[in-house]
Amino acid sequence: MASSRRGLLLLLLLTAHLGPSEAQHWSHGWYPGGKRALSSAQDPQNALRPPGRALDTAAGSPVQTAHGLPSDALAPLDDSMPWEGRTTAQWSLHRKRHLARTLLTAAREPRPAPPSSNKV
């Protein structure tokens, strides 16, 4: 019985996501901090590109787009990100594993006897 409770608790811990979600709700739009601007175009990806830079035209070929980027934009990313910059999903999984290990090891240890209530 105790092992089934422990298994159920472990299953709940691993499936429940306690951390904040990284997805942005559809109503917040594409602008940081809130709703879409009223003057924004229906397709925000094409609205952000300068004229002649749409990918479906000859002027917006991938080669020209790559030349329009800053020189370090195509450089390989280094793995020197500080721990604060990593995704919260990775850290919440780490926390879940730590909590599960703590609960499992605490369940294996014998519990001390409760204090007697027969004090005279």
From Swiss-Prot:
Keywords (A to Z) from UniProt: Amidation, Cleavage on pair of basic residues, Hormone, Secreted, Signal
Biological process, per Gene Ontology: signal transduction
PROSITE patterns xrefs: GNRH (PS00473)
Regions annotated as coiled coil: none
GO terms of molecular function: gonadotropin hormone-releasing hormone activity; gonadotropin-releasing hormone receptor binding; hormone activity
Residues in the signal sequence: 1-23
Compartments where found: Secreted
Glycine amide carried by residues: 33
Expression across tissues: Midbrain; expressed at significantly higher levels outside the brain (up to 30-fold), particularly in the kidney, bone marrow and prostate.
Domain of life: Eukaryota
GO cellular component, one term: extracellular space
Disulfide pattern: none
Residues covered by region (Disordered): 23-81
Stated role: Stimulates the secretion of gonadotropins; it stimulates the secretion of both luteinizing and follicle-stimulating hormones.
Record-stated family: Belongs to the GnRH family.
Entry protein name: Progonadoliberin-2
